[in-house]
């Protein structure tokens, strides 16, 4: 008896269904590194148009977290997809190496008691150790880049070019020194840039304090009264009592309506809109009378006494005064608030700062000298109470600025700092703010809402404090006049000389420099080296100049910057400002892409205390990096990205669908040689030509749309849908009969394999930017072997097809698919009640509208293959309907179809006539399915 199972084309797949990624990925990485894949790619891509994604440098401290992984994976998908789209897309990874967090770690490890040069040396060593750890993890994610030659902000050349960028901004006229209030962290002992500030809720004392008017006659005139009997007070409300010793004025809104109210305390001046709430706070319900009203402009230049110090307090008009809360009058301390500083500066009031760099009151401050501002709060609360000027005291919870590193509250404190001015006219007569806003207009944003966000931040941001009083940072290499504070007149030339030294020896070249090496003896008497270092955001914000402009393989401006949404106020902005403030005069990027933060499945932030942290190391060790990459790509990054074990298991199911599809494709291509066996398109079976159209259209959607627009979640959705619906549930389901049962080298089978070959090559190329390990594993089989790489190839080129013919083909097979779905639905009840086991055990009678019936009948005897039934008949009717029943034929042992011709051919008693022909004759022919 013949064993017909040996006559079917069931081949083993060289692509296993189980990926075993976690174990196999490291070996692939090792092999790619040994083959110098990245370097070979640069040679292959030489001469192509450039695409530059400039890497925003992660900070060189601690292990990478899941947010780092998302960021690097998204960048890698873009680099790979651009490469396959025909660009030369080099990727130079970078690290941010200077700054306080590293100082803090070095102090913890080695203490503080050492020479500063040794301290900086240890900081450099620590940063290098952290970079090595992070680099290993980034490479493990499959991120392709020049890992042997990354950029580091602590590289001597980069440090030198950061100094040169400082020189650019100096020459542009935007740099100035000023004693302005800046956000100051007492734990850092330094000013903070806006990007280093985060807002959290804080409970603060809220007090109403009365300032006695000196001259009630002038006050009466302001309110249009003949006179005022008794005492009168301007009442302020503040949540920072510690600033009261620095109070130098009270501000009123010029257009705000104020009332003079008679109360048991005396006459009080309060904003009309806030008076009722204020009087309730003071417990005044009886004996109240509104005497008069006026506007704030009439109160200007009236004078009061300080509530507990001997100090004259003028009334000013300030644009910052609102009637949202409080009293409508604002106590004004120019040393401790930007708006306070601005209004006092306008009125020529000299700044007084009683708080030192440690956050303690100077010795001249009565009662609180030597106390920290937080310790002094309760003492200061008692002070106006003793003088009878405290009207109310309570607690309030409000959003307050905190240090992003120490999580401690900040203070505004006036210090002598170096600023990049936003509204100062530069050497070209334009302000930096105007230039930056124009640069925003010239930038493309992904997602689009990023434009409004960055624009509003630039419109509202203060001048950029670029100086720091730290040790581990790029120095501000200026010589400053000892008496005037002015910069040396030859600063531009001196900066370049210093930069040349730093290029050779690093920042230590400045710190160890004796000024006599660069200055004349006379200049040495009058000028000192500036001890300040630069804000680390200046370091990273200058990398478009120090890296992109300097490295031969890169081009300025970059095409794309891609970072988390917090970088609108961080790296995106600092890069924008250095680009616009320098001779480049524009943003250093053409596009900005923003991704959200990673949260757990319940939308909560990752937190060790909650126990919901998902570490990338755990994910790639358990699931493989390709699963992490697929998760990152399949999640809409424009919002928060949710991750958990359950979510990753669902992602694994999508991966399995793609992998199983590839395994099937490779099994059925294992005896196919495209050079010898391919069938010309005109000679292909019709459904194979239709499948090629579906595959080509998938490629067009991804290569021509989703990848260039960075819409990776749509790309993943389309790939999975193509594998499960177009291939798995339709084309491959139909194809199995032809692949398995026709003669191995028949046109019918070779036509199918030709289609599968094109589909497989295209599919592997399409998944490769996302599933880089799986893509390369597959390309080893269908490409040029182990030394070849999917990245060495651009998108697949499909056989050309006439547009009109394609449209007709798609229309026809769309109708056939619709009919097939109706047939499948009609058979389902028969399967449910066990009347039939598989659809091949059924017959279908289809009623269809004329056009659809024509398409179905055109397939003739092959219609049953397309519908996966053993027999199909079609008649014309008004609408689609299907009647299904069990076949009365006999099951063919070889093809499993139920027919009435089993055993019709002598010697083939258990198989149908078609199978007898395929086994012993010339083989069947197919035209449609």
Curated annotation (Swiss-Prot):
It comes from the Bacteria. Its EC number is 6.1.1.5. GO terms for cellular component: cytosol. L-isoleucyl-5'-AMP binds at residue 563. Keywords: Aminoacyl-tRNA synthetase, ATP-binding, Cytoplasm, Ligase, Metal-binding, Nucleotide-binding, Protein biosynthesis, Zinc. Its cofactor is Zn(2+). Zn(2+) binds at residues 892, 895, 912, 915. It is found in: Cytoplasm. A motif ('KMSKS' region) lies at residues 605-609. The keyword rRNA processing does not apply. Binds 1 zinc ion per subunit. A motif ('HIGH' region) lies at residues 58-68. One of its GO terms (biological process) is isoleucyl-tRNA aminoacylation. It catalyses: tRNA(Ile) + L-isoleucine + ATP = L-isoleucyl-tRNA(Ile) + AMP + diphosphate. ATP binds at residue 608. Monomer. IleRS has two distinct active sites: one for aminoacylation and one for editing. The misactivated valine is translocated from the active site to the editing site, which sterically excludes the correctly activated isoleucine. The single editing site contains two valyl binding pockets, one specific for each substrate (Val-AMP or Val-tRNA(Ile)). Belongs to the class-I aminoacyl-tRNA synthetase family. IleS type 1 subfamily. This is Isoleucine--tRNA ligase. It comes from Neisseria gonorrhoeae (strain ATCC 700825 / FA 1090). The lineage of its organism: Bacteria, Pseudomonadati, Pseudomonadota, Betaproteobacteria, Neisseriales.
């Amino acid at each position: 008896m013949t064993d017909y199972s040996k006559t079917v084309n069931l081949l083993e797949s060289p692509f296993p269904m189980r990926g075993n990624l976690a174990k196999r990925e490291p070996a692939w990485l090792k092999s790619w590194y040994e083959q110098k894949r990245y370097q070979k790619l640069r040679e292959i891509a030489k001469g192509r148009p450039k695409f530059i994604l400039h890497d925003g440098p992660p900070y060189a401290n601690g292990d990478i977290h899941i947010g780092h992984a998302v960021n690097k994976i998204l960048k890698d998908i873009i680099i790979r997809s651009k490469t396959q789209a025909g660009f030369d897309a080099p990727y130079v990874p970078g690290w941010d190496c200077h700054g306080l967090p590293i100082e803090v770690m070095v102090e913890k490890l080695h203490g503080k008691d050492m020479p500063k040069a040794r301290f900086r040396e240890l900081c450099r060593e620590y940063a290098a150790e952290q970079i090595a750890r992070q680099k290993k993890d980034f490479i493990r994610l499959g991120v392709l880049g020049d890992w042997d030659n990354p950029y580091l902000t602590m590289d001597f050349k980069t440090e030198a070019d950061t100094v040169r960028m400082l020189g650019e901004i100096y020459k542009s006229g935007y740099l100035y020194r000023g004693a302005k209030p800046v956000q100051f962290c007492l734990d850092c002992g330094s000013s903070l840039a806006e990007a280093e500030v985060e807002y959290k809720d804080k409970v603060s004392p809220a007090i109403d304090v009365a300032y006695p008017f000196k001259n009630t006659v002038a006050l009466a005139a302001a309110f249009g009264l003949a006179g005022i009997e008794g005492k009168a007070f301007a009442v302020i409300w503040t949540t920072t009592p510690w600033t009261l010793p620095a109070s130098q004025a009270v501000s009123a809104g010029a257009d705000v309506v104020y009332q003079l109210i008679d109360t048991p305390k005396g006459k009080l001046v309060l904003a009309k809109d806030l008076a009722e709430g204020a009087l309730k706070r003071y417990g005044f319900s009886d004996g109240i009378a509104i005497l008069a009203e006026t506007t704030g402009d009439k109160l200007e230049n009236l004078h009061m006494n300080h509530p507990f110090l001997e100090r004259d307090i003028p009334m000013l008009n300030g644009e910052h005064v609102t009637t949202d809360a409080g009293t409508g009058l604002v106590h004004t301390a120019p040393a401790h608030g930007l708006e306070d500083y601005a209004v006092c500066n306008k009125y020529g009031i000299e700044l007084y700062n009683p708080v030192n760099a440690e956050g303690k009151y100077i010795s001249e401050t009565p009662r609180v000298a030597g106390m920290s501002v937080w310790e002094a709060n309760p003492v200061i609360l008692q002070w106006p109470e003793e003088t009878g000027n405290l009207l109310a005291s309570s607690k309030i919870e409000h959003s307050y600025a905190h240090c992003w590193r120490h999580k401690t509250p900040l203070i505004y404190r006036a210090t002598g700092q170096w600023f990049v001015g936003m509204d100062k006219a530069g050497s070209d007569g334009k302000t930096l703010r105007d230039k930056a806003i124009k640069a925003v207009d010239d930038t493309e944003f992904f997602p689009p809402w990023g434009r409004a966000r960055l624009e509003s931040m630039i419109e509202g941001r203060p001048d950029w404090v670029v100086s720091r009083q730290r040790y581990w940072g790029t120095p501000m290499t200026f010589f400053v006049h000892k008496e005037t504070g002015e910069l040396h007149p030859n600063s531009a030339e001196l900066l370049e000389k210093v930069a040349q030294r730093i290029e050779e020896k690093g920042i230590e070249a400045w710190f160890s420099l004796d000024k006599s090496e660069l200055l004349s003896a006379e200049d040495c008497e009058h000028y000192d080296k500036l001890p300040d270092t630069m804000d680390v955001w200046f370091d990273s914000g200058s990398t478009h100049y120090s890296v992109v402009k300097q490295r031969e393989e890169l081009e300025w401006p970059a095409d794309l910057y891609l970072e988390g949404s917090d970088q609108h106020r961080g790296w995106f902005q600092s890069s924008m400002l250095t680009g616009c403030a320098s001779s480049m005069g524009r943003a250093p990027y053409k596009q900005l892409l923003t991704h959200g933060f990673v949260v757990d499945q319940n939308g909560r932030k990752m937190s060790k205390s909650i126990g919901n942290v998902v570490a990338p190391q755990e994910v790639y060790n358990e699931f493989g990096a390709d699963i992490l990459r697929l998760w990152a790509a399949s999640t809409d990054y424009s919002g928060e990205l949710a991750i958990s074990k359950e979510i990753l298991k669902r992602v694994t199911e999508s991966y399995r669908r793609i992998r199983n599809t590839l395994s099937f494709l490779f099994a059925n291509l294992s005896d196919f040689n495209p050079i010898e066996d391919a069938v010309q398109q005109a000679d292909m079976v019709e459904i194979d030509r239709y499948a090629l159209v579906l595959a080509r259209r998938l490629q067009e959607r991804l290569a021509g749309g989703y990848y260039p627009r960075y819409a990776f979640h749509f790309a993943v959705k389309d790939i999975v849908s193509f594998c499960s619906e177009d291939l798995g549930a339709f084309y491959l389901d139909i194809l199995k009969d032809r692949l398995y049962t026709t003669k191995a080298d028949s046109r019918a089978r070779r036509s199918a394999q030709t289609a599968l070959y094109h589909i497989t090559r295209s599919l592997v190329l399409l998944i490769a930017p996302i599933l880089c390990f799986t893509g390369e594993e597959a390309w080893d089989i269908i490409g040029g072997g182990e030394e070849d790489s999917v990245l060495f190839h651009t998108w697949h080129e499909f056989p050309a097809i006439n547009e009109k013919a394609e449209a007709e083909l798609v229309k026809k097979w769309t109708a056939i698919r619709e009919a097939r779905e109706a047939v499948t639905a009609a058979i389902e009840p028969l399967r449910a009640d066990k009347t039939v086991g598989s659809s091949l055990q059924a017959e279908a009678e289809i009623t269809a509208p004329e056009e659809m019936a024509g398409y179905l009948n055109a397939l003739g005897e092959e219609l049953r293959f397309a519908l996966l039934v053993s027999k199909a008949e079609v008649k014309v009717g008004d609408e689609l309907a299907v009647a299904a029943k069990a076949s009365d034929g006999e099951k063919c042992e070889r093809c499993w179809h139920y027919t009435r011709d089993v055993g019709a051919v002598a010697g083939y008693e258990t198989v149908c006539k078609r199978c007898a022909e395929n086994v012993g004759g010339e083989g069947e022919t197919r035209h449609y399915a």
